[in-house]
């Protein structure tokens, strides 16, 4: 199958390598390459992997993504547009309603920043597809081949919330682990010994629970901005909960010992 990928950051590059591994022809477009958006017009599916950075108010800035979708609409792209970029819940449905000449779905990724391509090919736990169209769902399942262990058919809103659920829960675990690390330090207990004992209860894995002097709070491109985006969304929804704000505030106390991407 001939696929397009717009945006060759960590996510776009991982998608490119992964789909080439499956055997597809991949046509990339990125502002750093000598390419144009017209290059993807004859592809069956185009994956949008452009940045959705944090806005000044903490919300998710979808400006770049919206401009790409608008351009594809103006060019009458006839393939499936699969949004990989993280977006606020409701965005995909808004794009579907706005650009009725396009076929748009949301396909979140759950890749770790430091090993995204490896995860796409060898650690692809879940393929979640947010669409109302069963044909689109089946087409996305087909293009991923045998890489995903599980597939899930969701609505666009559900898939968007799932992406934030994944990242914010990761941030919550990191912050909880760091707080308990401080408790252990004050009580002259070995945090790793306690953490490893807890893992043996079978109630959790040790993912995101490792803490040591050189590995503290979360960093990277995703967890900080996504945590603040959900905090901003809570305000928009008039939900008065402090948990997410507290996660971000407490993480700032540990951030100085984090290498970029280590906790992604």
Kindly give the residue locations of the regions a language model identified.
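Rossmann-like NAD(P)(H) cofactor-binding subdomain of soluble oxidoreductases
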Residues: 53-115
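Short acidic/histidine-rich motifs immediately flanking catalytic phosphotransfer sites
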Residues: 41-45, 76-79
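NAD(P)+-binding Rossmann beta1-loop-alpha1 motif at the extreme N-terminus of oxidoreductases
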Residues: 1-42
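Glycine-rich, N-terminal phosphate-binding loop of Rossmann-like dinucleotide-binding domains
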Residues: 48-51, 85, 131
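ATP-dependent carboxylate/acyl-activation modules
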Residues: 232-236, 249-264
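Internal alpha-helical scaffold of NAD(P)-dependent oxidoreductase catalytic cores
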Residues: 22, 94-107, 113-207, 233-239, ...
């Amino acid at each position: 199958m001939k696929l397009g990928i717009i945006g060759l950051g960590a996510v776009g590059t991982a998608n490119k390598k992964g789909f080439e591994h499956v055997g597809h022809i991949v046509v990339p477009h990125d502002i750093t390459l000598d390419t144009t958006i017209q290059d993807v017009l004859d592809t069956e599916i185009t994956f949008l992997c452009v940045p959705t950075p944090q806005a000044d108010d903490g919300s998710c800035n979808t400006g770049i993504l919206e401009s790409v979708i608008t351009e594809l609409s103006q060019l009458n792209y006839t393939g499936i547009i699969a949004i990989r970029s993280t977006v606020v819940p409701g965005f995909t449905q808004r794009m579907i309603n706005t650009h009725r000449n396009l076929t748009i779905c949301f396909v979140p990724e759950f890749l770790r920043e430091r090993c995204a391509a490896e995860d796409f090919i060898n650690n692809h736990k879940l393929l979640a597809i947010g669409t109302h169209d069963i044909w689109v769902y089946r087409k996305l399942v087909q293009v991923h081949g045998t890489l995903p262990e599980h597939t899930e058919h969701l609505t666009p809103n559900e898939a968007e919330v799932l992406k934030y659920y994944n990242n914010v829960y990761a941030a919550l675990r990191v912050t909880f682990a760091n707080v308990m690390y401080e408790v252990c330090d004050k009580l002259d207990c070995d945090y790793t010994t306690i953490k490893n004992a807890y893992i043996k209860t079978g109630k959790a894995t040790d993912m995101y629970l490792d803490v040591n002097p050189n590995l503290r709070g979360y960093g990277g491109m995703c967890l900080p901005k996504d945590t603040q985006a959900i905090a901003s969304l809570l305000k928009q929804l008039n939900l008065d909960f402090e948990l997410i704000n507290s996660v971000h505030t407490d993480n700032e106390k540990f951030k100085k010992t984090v290498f970029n991407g280590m906790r992604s």
